[in-house]
């Protein structure tokens, strides 16, 4: 009973503190290129706000000017309000080429009153199929919320308002590919995916509710390692703790050398997954009838991460 009480107190304290998280953002004009949408994406308010639009003709999207090899990136997002069924808003990291790496946040719209689903995935060398989905436990359309990706040599962690919701560990020792050699850009987009996004495609986009708008602010890449090209030559080594390619050596050391989550973070992770997870590829034996992926059966339990 005492241990249960302490667990509740610990989680409550962690959740309360995470609300105080402050993200210092950059100027979108300096850090972001709007890459598609024919004017449906706009940078406003002296570079502090970016809106993406979607109508029946097209969605819109952007990418970071810089590429990163490892980092912690944050974005505050306010999702499409009202009947957003069929729409997908994204925030993700992705490399180039046919054997790309990718770390995804995708927010699946729904009919008014139903909760949003956040869809996460990790691609390595062009292969994904590592989906985990969660209901959001708040209204993501009423205010901006902070979404973060931590990617270092040991693990990848997805955060919402400072709370870890998923961890993908480096299990190369077991033959599981891990993103480590390909620099990634940060991307965001708003697009129509009514063939699959809402109830497996059963609910279609109601275009009379459009145009749809998702808003982004406070992009923070201060703790990301910029992949640099000097005199036409690509720097092939990632930054390490204290490297000048990151703007803050002390904070770089903290996230770069992190080998796993501490006990309090693990408790919050378990709480989120127990309460809000709606799909986990590591539990889908029907889909993987010939055996679950290696990381799902590893002793260090990537199954719940």
From Swiss-Prot:
S-S bonds: 225-239, 282-296
Site feature (Important for catalytic activity) residues: 104
Matches recorded under PROSITE patterns: GH16_1, GH16_2
Biological process per Gene Ontology, one example term: cell wall biogenesis
Enzyme nomenclature, EC number: 2.4.1.207
Reaction catalysed by this enzyme: breaks a beta-(1->4) bond in the backbone of a xyloglucan and transfers the xyloglucanyl segment on to O-4 of the non-reducing terminal glucose residue of an acceptor, which can be a xyloglucan or an oligosaccharide of xyloglucan
Induction (UniProt): Down-regulated by auxin.
CDD domains on file: GH16_XET
InterPro entries in alphabetical order: Beta-glucanase/XTH (IPR044791), ConA-like_dom_sf (IPR013320), GH16 (IPR000757), GH16_AS (IPR008263), XET_C (IPR010713), XTH (IPR016455)
Keywords: Apoplast, Cell wall, Cell wall biogenesis/degradation, Disulfide bond, Glycoprotein, Glycosidase, Hydrolase, Secreted, Signal, Transferase
GO cellular component: apoplast
UniProt protein name: Probable xyloglucan endotransglucosylase/hydrolase protein 21
């Amino acid at each position: 009973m005492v241990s249960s009480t302490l667990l509740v107190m610990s989680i409550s304290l962690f959740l309360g503190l995470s609300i105080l998280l402050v993200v210092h953002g950059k100027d979108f004009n300096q850090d972001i290129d709007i890459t598609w949408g024919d004017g449906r994406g706009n940078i406003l308010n002296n570079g502090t706000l970016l809106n993406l639009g979607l109508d029946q003709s097209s969605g819109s999207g952007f990418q970071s000017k810089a590429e990163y090899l490892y980092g912690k990136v944050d974005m505050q997002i306010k999702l499409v309000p009202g009947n957003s069924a069929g729409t997908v808003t994204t925030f993700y990291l992705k490399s180039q080429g046919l054997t790309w790496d990718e770390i995804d946040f995708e927010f699946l719209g729904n009919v008014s009153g139903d909760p949003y689903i956040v869809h996460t995935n990790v691609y390595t060398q062009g292969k994904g199929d590592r989906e985990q989905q969660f209901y959001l436990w708040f209204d993501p359309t009423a205010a901006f919320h902070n979404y973060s990706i931590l990617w270092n040599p040991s693990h990848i962690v997805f955060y919402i308002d400072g709370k870890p919701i998923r961890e993908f560990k480096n299990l190369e020792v077991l033959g599981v590919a891990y993103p480590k050699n390909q620099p990634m850009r940060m991307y965001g987009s708003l697009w129509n995916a009514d063939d699959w996004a809402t109830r497996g495609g059963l609910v279609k986009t109601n275009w009379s509710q459009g145009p749809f708008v998702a808003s982004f602010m406070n992009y923070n890449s201060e703790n990301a390692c910029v992949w640099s090209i000097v005199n036409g030559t690509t720097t092939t080594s990632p930054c390490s703790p204290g490297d000048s390619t990151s703007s803050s050596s002390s904070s770089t050391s903290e996230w770069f050398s992190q080998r796993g989550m501490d006990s309090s973070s693990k408790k919050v992770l378990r709480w989120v997954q127990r309460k809000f997870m709606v799909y986990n590829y590591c539990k889908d034996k029907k889909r993987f009838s010939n055996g679950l992926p290696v990381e799902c059966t590893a002793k260090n339990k990537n199954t719940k991460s």
